């Protein structure tokens, strides 16, 4: 069902880490994002998401970064997200 896999890393206060599965789960649920483009996503593990071809890694990173920053996950700083196809 899912056509591609993304490796998702977050940068918080200059430190890189795999995005926690809990954050990916919450973000990919439509009632949190209210965006249909994230409907066809499946968080698999820390730092790993499967997605349809409707979604680009760049758009996923942009949306997740804004969402994490809005929720204060960056400890007062913007959260930078990198997503790439694996």
Q: Where do the protein language model's features map onto the residues?
A:
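Charge-rich, low-complexity N-terminal segments
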Residues: 1-86
């Amino acid at each position: 069902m899912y056509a591609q896999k993304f490796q998702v890393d977050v940068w918080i206060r200059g430190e890189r880490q795999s995005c926690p599965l809990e954050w990916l789960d919450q973000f990919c649920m439509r009632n949190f994002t209210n965006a249909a483009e994230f409907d066809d996503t499946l968080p698999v593990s820390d730092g790993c998401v499967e997605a349809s071809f409707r979604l680009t890694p760049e758009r996923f990173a942009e949306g997740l970064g804004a969402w994490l920053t809005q929720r204060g996950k960056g400890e007062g700083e913007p959260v930078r997200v990198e997503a790439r196809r694996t």
